[in-house]
Each structure stands twice: as structure tokens, then as C-alpha cells.
Amino acid sequence: FQMKILDLTVPAKQAFISTAGPAAVVKALNKLNRPEVEHTFDRLSPMYIERKHMKEGLRRLWKTYELDRCKIDCPSWSAAKIFGMKFPGEKSGGFGIRVPTSLDIGDEQSKAKQFMTTANYLVGIIETMRAILRVELDPVVRLTKLRAVLREVTAVVTKMAFKPELRQNEKDREKVRIFFLVPLLHYIVSKVLCEPVHDYMMNRKGFRVGNRWLGGGARKYAAAMGAWDEDRTFGCGDVGGKDTKFKASDISVLLASILRCYRMDGSDEAFITQVWMEWLVDNTAYHIVNWPGGFRFVVGLLFSGDYNTSFLNTMHVLWAIHSYGAWCHDVHGIDPVTTLRDGVPVLSVWVQGDDVTMSSCDDRFDIHSLNGYLKKWDLELKEDSVVKTKQFFADVDLVSGMIRTPPDQCIVFLKRVIYTDGHVVRPFRDIRDIGYRLYYTTTGVPDHAQYCAKLAGLMLDTMGTNEPGWRFCRAMIGNIIKQKRATLEGMVSAMEGDYFVKTRMYKQGLQDASAEAIWDLTNDKSMLLERVDGYYVTPEEEYLQKQSYDDRPMMGSKY
């Protein structure tokens, strides 16, 4: 991996040196043949994909310089084309991305030279990381040094932009988001790390999973990939109202290569993957949404709203499936690689940005065991589809409040925070860290009754299928009511006003029940409001328990 950017091809180098400008470089780079990666197990490791497609990611970044008419240090992802709007201060719309000061070589220099400086800086970072891996043998020292290197490229908010949702839904019509925009260097990092896997999941050589939200639309893409051909179906999704089928084997090889990292404790791939996960966590920030009646906080990435969001979200979903593999391996003694291979289908996945559809492909795992980890409180569990798979649909949204459970039920979905235990990466987020902040009244204050209603609906949905999640929901409601932040009556009133929770109440026969009756029916005498034995409590959680809600640190701190 001793790669220099200028050694792409002889024509590319000549074009760069010539006076023709960036257009000639783009033309030369466009002639590069896209490398074809064979669908073999070893050749799809994350590090192999990164090495193979570094040129491709940089080539696409080159192309953006020519397409966008922005300032020298503000390459854009054609936001005017994507969103049909212009941002304040931009000539033709687009995101204002500034190169970090240490990389800024002056406005008088050419776009090409500025880009090459940034790209070479990135290659230097990667080379430094690999040198650490070669020299340091102690795993803790390795990880410490890798984290120190990667900290140099921590994203900094340099600019914000506002964008209306442009939806027809009455509730969301006036919603406006604030987007956090990041330096060019972080675009390159995210493209190099995330785009190859994302691309393979979406539109490459049989990895027919997910849809491109740019360029053609879901129906066109589904038709192009043969989604409705009966002889090539396994698993099921939904595109344009039609059942869309795909092979579970299409994604199995890719997932298997990622799952390998779980058991590659001394490898370069495992350590770089761990550090990369921490980098994602370091760039997790609060997303501010301006609703008609006021503001509310949503947990999101600094990349929220730009072209790379889809890449990063896809990777988070992949890591959810990685956790599923760990669950298979540690708890049930099943090799997750074998589990996902042809002939032993267990789980098929459809990923599009932050939306995911999963199908249980046989009877080995109970589909209900996944309840309580998804944003939609009412899981739409359908009957056997035309391809004989039971499926459920779930929207993994940035506003979800996640339930943390013991490691033996570790299905971790989008926007879970990661922390390290020694050199082991583990998932962590206490729902109290963010949960009640997600539901605001029109006056801009937390609506604890609505939050309790969501928890109650989730508790009803998971009763008997996810005991740790059920206990935690009940404990949360009990604590909020004890603190007199909400009442049972207020919770039930909010439940009646929430479509999904109300649907769940009707299914439980609670539509006319009083608040006390609902509480009694959902209560098991063995389930106390206090902490119960067997619930996995981390030091971070113990720290958070000792603080009041208002004093608890916001996300983005080390907790």
C-alpha cells in the first residue's frame, strides 16, 4: 500500500502537470478502469477493499471539483441539484467545506494543488497508522497510538446551513433542519472508509442490497437488478409497492468478511477497524431540528444532511449485523461466517441509508427476539411472503431511543455509542442520556408524558420476548413518575394520542383501561422498579445514575 496520488497513470500525471487544468485530470482519471473485485472470501476484507478503491474514491472527489462552481476551498456535493435549493452565501448552492488551517495553502493556488495536498496528507495518516501496527506489538499501546493519530482528523464544525424538509406530510411540512458541515479532509476519510462497502452493498456485481437515492430512483434500480425475477429471489423487501426480492447470498460474503474481524484479534484489519469505529463515535453530535413550535435535539452525525450520510448510516447498520454475528458466536456457539453463507440462510438485509429491512429466513432464530431495538414501536410483522420468508420492516432513525441490553442479546442498531473496555470495543448508550430530550412540547420543554407513552408502548410490544428491555422500560417510567415529571394519567393520555402505541394498546385489550389498570397489567410482581440482578451495568451507567437529568452531560462528551 505504498501509494502516491500522482502515480495514478501516465496520462493522469501528464494532465496534472500540463496547463490544461483540472478538467484534463478528470478526463484522464475517468479513463481508469474500475477494478473488479472477485467474490472470494479473503479478497473482500475491509482493508483489501480500502486499498483497492482508494484511487476510485479520490477520482470521484476530483470530479466534484469540476462539477461545482464554488470557492476554491469549498468543494460541494451539488446540493443545489440534490435538494433543489441554494444555501446562503454560495454562488450556486452547495455545502461550504473548508480545508483545515494546517492544510490551507492559500486561495491563489490551484484547486488541483490544494486537493493533492489534502489527499497526500490523508495517505500520510494511513501510512502512519500502518507503521504503528508494524512496530507496536502490545494491543493496548497499539490502540492508544492509533487513537492519537486519528484524533488529528477529528471533524470540526465550520459552517451550518438550513434546509426545509419539502415534504407533503402536514406534520413535517414546516420542519427545518440545521446541517453541520465538515472540512474536505473528512469527506475524503469517509469516502475512503465507507464508500467501497456501501457501493458493494448497493450496486456492484451481485451485492444487490439497498437503493441509490441519487440517480434513477428505487423502482428503476430494482428493475435493473432483476428484483422481480422469480428465479433469483431470497429474502424480501418493498420498492414502489411491489415485493422486491434478492439473494441472501449476495450480502453474505461481504458480511462474512466484516465478521471475520471479530475473531482477528492481532490483525491490522481488526485494529484499524476498531479505531475507525471510535472515529465515528468521536464525530457523533447533536442534530438540532426546528419544529413549528420550537427546537428539539436529535442525535446525529456531523455529516448529517450531506452526501456521505448514506455511507455512514449504511456502515452503522453493517455494524449492527456484526453484533448479531457476535451474538451467534459467543452465546450460541455458531460460527457467524458459516451462518451467513449459502445453504444456511438466517438473516437477509435490505439497507438504504438509515432504513433497513430484515427477513428471518428460517426457524433458527425467533424474529420476535429483535423487538425493542428498532425505532418503529409497532413492528409490521407480515405473513409468509411469496418467497416464504417472514419479514418485518423497521426505520432505523436518528431520533430513536435505544434500549441497552446484556451482551447475550446484542443486536445493536443505528446511532449506538461505542466505548472501549481495554482494547475491546463495546456498545454503550444509556437511554436516559438522550431519551427524554427527543420529545419536546410546543413550548420547547421536554414532554415526559409523551416519552413515557413511547416507553409504555415499547414495553407492551416486548413483553415476553425481550425481558431486559421490558424491565428497563418499566424502570424508566417508574423513575420519571417518582420524580413527578409525569403522571400515569398523562402517560395514558399521550398513549391514546400516539397511533402506534394506541394500536399496541388495542391489541392488548387496553383501549378502555385506566392508567392504574394499564400499569397493573404490565406489571409482574417479580419485576421491581429498582435494578434487578442480571442487568449488565457499566461504570459509565453507574456514573450517570448518580446525576439528575438536568446535570447529565450531553452526548459528545466522553459519556
Language model features by range: what are they?
Residues F1-Y559:
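Viral RNA-dependent RNA polymerase
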